[in-house]
Amino acid sequence: MDAPINPSSPTRSSYETALERQWLIKDEPSHHVDLGCHFTLEIKAFSPKMIELLETGSLTLGSVYQGLYNLIKDKDCKGLELDRDTTHGNKLHVLAAAFLCVLRKYENQVRFYNVKTKDSLTGEIQYMSRVHIGDDNLGLFDPDTYRMIGGSFPEGIYRLNLRTQLTPRGEDDGLEIIMGTILTVPVRGPADRQPLGVLMDRQLRQFPVGTNPWSSLGEAKPKGRSLSLLRGILM
């Protein structure tokens, strides 16, 4: 599939403006199929100051999205892998849809699963946060929701993976980011194929095997204000 996802409104000239504004047409009947999502975001901090950002919740899902959005809109983004039906033309729609899936999954609670570890060889302390939707039949959301990002998704499997470093404004040190996204249109669950978590583990080897790997990785802390910040960015 070479053609990019087309914006719903002919008045918009770019995918960027589709993501920066709210385009929700309530009167027009929906004809889209449901979208399934497998999504994993891993954030690692190594310096004391960056560890504190994650521990205190100063770093929100919305701020991470804003950093990723600004990064991958560059055609030559380092560490970005596009495969299957994801193209440079539709990659920002895929990113936005994946984050909307996270919001729908957790509804009013966006959670980071946090754990602090110590390297057995170097003794280095690192702090890791993960956001995860582990099975695409849990990542459903209604078609009208993803119309807010200004596009409709043709049938296919959209994969977007990114390994990079984000540095907050005014800071010298950064955060290591690994994101893996698979969107399926229409939804494809375990009934007709293997869970998408199996495919994700093959692509991102350091994630634990299985579709719910975070149960033993530490306390889940609600990040309610992430929701409003992320919505402000998307809309």
UniProtKB/Swiss-Prot annotation:
InterPro entries recorded: Viral_M
Q: What is this protein called?
A: Matrix protein
Query: What family does the database annotate?
Result: Belongs to the nucleorhabdovirus type-2 matrix protein family.
The misc remark on file is: Most abundant protein in the virion.
Q: What does this protein do?
A: Plays a major role in assembly and budding of virion. Completely covers the ribonucleoprotein coil and keep it in condensed bullet-shaped form. Inhibits viral transcription and stimulates replication.
Query: Which keywords does UniProt give here?
Result: Apoptosis, Host membrane, Membrane, Viral envelope protein, Viral matrix protein, Virion
Location of this chain's protein in the cell: Virion membrane; Host endomembrane system
Q: How does it assemble?
A: Homomultimer. Interacts with nucleoprotein and with the cytoplasmic domain of glycoprotein.
So where does this one cross the membrane?
A: none
Q: Does the keyword Membrane apply?
A: yes
Question: What broad class describes the main subcellular location of this protein?
Answer: virion
Care to name a GO molecular-function term for this sequence? structural constituent of virion
The UniProt entry lists membrane topology as: Peripheral membrane protein
